[in-house]
Structure formats: C-alpha cells, structure tokens
Amino acid sequence: MATVALPDWTRAVVKVGSALVAPDDRGCSTTHLLPIARFVIQSRRQGKEVILVSSGAVAAGLAEQGRGGPGTGLSIPERQALAALGQPLLMAHWRRLFDVPCAQVLLTYDDLQRRARFVNAKNTIAELLDRDTLPIVNENDTVATEELRVGDNDNLAAYVAVLAEADLLVICSDVDGLYTADPHDDPDAERLPAVDAITDEIYDMVGPSHRKVATGGMQTKVEAAEKATDRGIDTVLVNGTKGGHLDALGRGEMPGTLFRQAEQPLPARKHWMLHALPSAGRLTVDAGAADALRHEGASLLPSGIVAVEGRFARGDAVEIAVEKEGNRTRVAKGITQYGAADLERIQGRQSHAIAEVLDEAPADYVVHRDDLVVEA
C-alpha cells in the first residue's frame, strides 16, 4: 500500500466522536482522549492552531443520571435536557487535559445557514485563537430542534473548518479509515490511503452506522469530507481508539485515509449556498437547460423549467435537477428570483412573456448564474 504523507497545515479542526469521549456508554473517559490531547498540545507547541469539535454531551448526561446505555430513541426534550446536563461535564473533562484556557462554543444549524450569524461565529473563533485559547465546539442540542439540527458532529466539524478557514480537518473515530467495503462483512475489504475526489463510487462504499450513542456513521464522515474538500480543506479520517495513530499524525504520517482538497475549491459564498443553505424546493429542467448550466455558465431561464416542486418564496434556495429515463440527477443549486406559485405559471415560457403572465418581471431569469452552484 502506497505511503501517504500528511499535508502541511497551520490551522486544524479536530473532531472527536462520542465513541471516543464516552466509550462503552460509561460517560466521559480519558481512555482515548489522552493521545488526542497530546496531538493538540504538540501541534500548539509547533505554532499551529487547533479547534476541537467534541461530541459526548448527551452521553455524559445519561451517565450522570446513572442511566448509561444507548442514547438512541430519545425524544427532543429528553435530548435537550440531557445535553444541558452533560455539556458542563464534557467541558470540565476536556479542561483537565490542557494547561491553556478552553472556551465553549455552542452552535446551531441556524448559525450556519444564516450568513450574518455564520460570520459572527467565524469572528468569535478567530478572536479566541488570537487570545491563545482552545475553542471547543459542540452543537447546541439544548435549543436545537429536529428540523433545525446539523444532526451529527462530523458535518458540524466540516462547517467549523470552513468558517474558521482551517486547512486541515481531522475526524477521529473508531474506524481505521475508508474501506472499499465494510471490513466487518467483507474480508477482502481494503483501506484506501487517499481519496482524490468524492464521487458516487465513494458513497457506494459507505456502510450503515452501528453506533449506539453517536448519530453519525461512515456516510456522515464522507459527507463532512466532501464539505471540507470542496472548500480546499484536506480531510483526514483516523482511528482515535488507537493512540499510535494520533502519534503518527503528529509526526506528519498518514495512518488513516486522506481526502485531498478539491483542485478547484468553491468560493466562500457558493460553498455556503451549496452546503449550508437549506433547499426549499426543486426545479426539474429539460436537457438543454441542464447542458447550458453545466457547460455554458448560463443563468436558468423559465423556458427550461418543466416541473416545480415545494413551497418556496423569492430568495429561497432550490435544487435544480434533470430527469432522464426515469432517473433524476441534481444539476445545481441556486437562489430563485421567483416563488413557487409564480414559477408554476411561467415555467416553459420565454423570458419576455413573464410580465404578460405575472403583470411584473423582477428578473428575466429564474436563477442568475452568480447565485448558482453547478454540481461537478
């Protein structure tokens, strides 16, 4: 197997999963955290900056109440209460491992999808780093609802890496890396030392999660890697239960899987549109419109739209797809200039007919190319 070196970096986000923070559902434990802390301390001594994204608040809350066991199947109020109980315990646990100030940063999905709040979070983390403080980030489960949750800290870590302008994302889990198949089921499965691009083939390799407390599985790790690499951030998946892997990482070696940054990273605004802004609906377009979006850098015109789905307003994000032989493929995502009701009236029509149908024409396009992110 080819040797892969860890790319040079100056600022990293290190994500630590529940399986490492609270192994065997016993609440917070240092069993797997000492090597991670050693990596963070060593990196800081080398003049590098590190941000931690730590799961484990709900698991800590369960253990504090003497319940332990799986954290699955909890209602939203139960999860919120247990997170409120466990988050201080989680922070205290981390503080014992470091001799530098640690700052708690709790984020919600709303903080990530609203651009102004995204920038506020970015500025807060930048200020903490300037003050030589170790930011420790978690999702604010105490106020998050099912509809407004990131849902897993793999993807949260990717969002944090983007807003913090990190150049490395390290996902510490209980797996050795990405395999060609589930190694528990397939003895011929091989670990991939590096992934150059995250394609449908890569997603096909991903198996389901079997974690008890954790909400993420291998799929969420690949999703997180895609978010990060799309913005030019190298991403590493390592086994945090094997202390030697973290020590190797500290030496610049690559014991897990490296997801290499995209050759052409997305600009900040388009990355936010694609990965953070929720889609409120979907527009299906004809093959000609799809080709124009993909290959000509065109705006989406009403003439190319064949179907409108969802209830959305002007300024909302919508997915744009093309259907061929019964299969629907996403082409792009963008911010629409027209709501769903108006689009149902003007779909398939030429731009000059918009005013005739609606009595007004705010724009002669539905999605401007500057507000459009085309899928690779």
Curated annotation (Swiss-Prot):
Q: What class of enzyme is it?
A: transferase
Which terms in the Gene Ontology molecular function aspect does this entry carry?
ATP binding; glutamate 5-kinase activity; RNA binding
- Note the PROSITE patterns from the entry: PUA
Q: Which InterPro entries match?
A: AceGlu_kinase-like_sf, Asp/Glu/Uridylate_kinase, G5K_ProB, Glu/AcGlu_kinase, Glu_5kinase, Glu_5kinase/COase_Synthase, PUA, PUA-like_sf
Q: Entry's Gene3D superfamilies?
A: Acetylglutamate kinase-like, PUA domain
PUA domain boundaries: 280-361
Q: Which UniProt keywords apply?
A: Amino-acid biosynthesis, ATP-binding, Cytoplasm, Kinase, Nucleotide-binding, Proline biosynthesis, Transferase
EC code: 2.7.2.11
Gene Ontology terms describing biological process? L-proline biosynthetic process
- Give the residues the record marks as binding ATP: 15, 173-174, 215-221
Report the superkingdom from the record. Bacteria
**Places the protein is found:** Cytoplasm
SUPFAM superfamilies per the UniProt record, alphabetical: Carbamate kinase-like, PUA domain-like
Quick one: a GO cellular component term? Answer: cytosol
Where is substrate bound in this sequence? 55, 141, 153
Recorded catalytic reaction(s): these are: L-glutamate + ATP = L-glutamyl 5-phosphate + ADP
Name its pathway: Amino-acid biosynthesis; L-proline biosynthesis; L-glutamate 5-semialdehyde from L-glutamate: step 1/2
What is the recorded function of this protein according to its Swiss-Prot or TrEMBL entry? Catalyzes the transfer of a phosphate group to glutamate to form L-glutamate 5-phosphate.
Give the family this protein belongs to, as stated in its UniProt record: Belongs to the glutamate 5-kinase family.
Which NCBIfam families does UniProt cross-reference here? proB
Q: Spell out the protein name for this chain.
A: Glutamate 5-kinase
Q: Which organism is it from?
A: Salinibacter ruber (strain DSM 13855 / M31)
